[in-house]
Amino acid sequence: MKNTILAAVAVVLTAAVVYAQKVTVDSDPAAPFGGYKTYAWVAGTAAPNPLNEDRLHASVDARLSARGLGMNTTTPDVYVTTHVTTKERQELIASGFGYGPWLGGGYGTTSVQTYIDGTLVVDFYDAKTKKMVWRGVATATASDKPTKNAEKMNKALDKMFAKFPIGAQATR
């Protein structure tokens, strides 16, 4: 049983963590967002699974391109980095009813449900000052289905970038 749970956790972690439901963003109001035209990825960050890292980068790239930012690995205006973390959470679920026959003891069951909560963080740093200028954070319960996690990731990125202060669609 324990091996089955560990295997399920491993599948969830490698299949695709995280992404969606609760999304928050924060930005530096003094940052010169209007002057940012190019970006580059900071190497060595993102998801623990290379497939997910590729999907995540492609999804962020598409959103940045739609906002008018272009990739420039030599002299970018901003650096982009992502972080993915997971945490196991357990909930105790009790069910039953209070009285048995002749007002005796009740019947009930208790079970433990294990979830994997994931967090996706997207950070932007000004290339000149090296200061963080924008952060988007999404948290959700991961699924054991990679396609569901990809949907959650894209939904979270849509919510994040709806509040991104660069581009024609930006809402500040």
For the regions a language model picked out, list residue spans one by one:
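Positively charged n-region of N-terminal signal peptides that target proteins for export
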Residues: 1-7
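A structural "domain/chain start" motif
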Residues: 19-67, 75-84, 88-92, 168-172
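C-terminal/domain-edge helix-coil "capping" segments
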Residues: 20-32, 112-119, 126-134, 139-172
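Surface-exposed short loop/turn segments
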Residues: 23, 67, 78, 82-131, ...
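Short helix-to-loop capping/linker segments positioned immediately adjacent to catalytic or ligand/cofactor-binding
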Residues: 66-71, 145
